[in-house]
């Protein structure tokens, strides 16, 4: 039976959260929606740096890393700025991607356009 995309996405974000916590990150928020700008899958902190993390996963032949597009990164960056401004936070930050391929997790820190 085929998993519904929302359920599969939630399971992937649960796995991503567990991975980040095991790596010493403190997860602050999940699925943060920044008005009309977009959504950030996970906001976490480690070593005085705030991380805005896009989670991509897949089961098929297509590598989910290719779903981290320039358009998606712009939305995450704009949402990150909105988050920090609305919370009055002024710290170093990083936009990252966490790629899940089956049971393999790849963390790509400081993704740029």
Swiss-Prot record:
Top-rank taxon of the source lineage equals Bacteria
Q: Which is one GO molecular function term here?
A: nucleic acid binding
Q: List the disulfide bonds.
A: none
Gene3D superfamilies reported for this sequence:
3.40.1350.10
InterPro entries, per the entry: Restrct_endonuc-II-like, tRNA_endonuc-like_dom_sf, UPF0102_YraN-like
Q: What Pfam families does the annotation carry? A: UPF0102 (PF02021)
Q: Which HAMAP family match?
A: UPF0102
What NCBIfam families does the database record attribute to this sequence?
A: PRK12497.2-4
The entry sums up its family as follows: Belongs to the UPF0102 family.
Task: State what protein this is by name.
Answer: UPF0102 protein SUN_0231
Q: What is the lineage of its organism?
A: Bacteria, Pseudomonadati, Campylobacterota, Epsilonproteobacteria, Campylobacterales
């Amino acid at each position: 039976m085929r998993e519904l995309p929302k359920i599969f996405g939630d399971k992937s974000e649960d796995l991503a959260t567990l991975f980040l916590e095991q790596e010493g990150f403190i997860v602050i928020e999940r699925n943060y929606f920044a008005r009309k700008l977009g959504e950030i899958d996970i906001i976490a902190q480690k070593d005085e740096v705030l991380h805005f993390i896009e989670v991509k996963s897949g089961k098929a032949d297509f590598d989910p890393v290719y779903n981290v597009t320039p358009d998606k990164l712009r939305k995450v960056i704009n949402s990150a700025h909105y988050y920090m401004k609305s919370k009055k936070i002024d710290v170093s930050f990083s936009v990252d991607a966490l790629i899940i391929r089956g049971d393999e997790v790849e963390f790509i820190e400081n993704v740029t356009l």
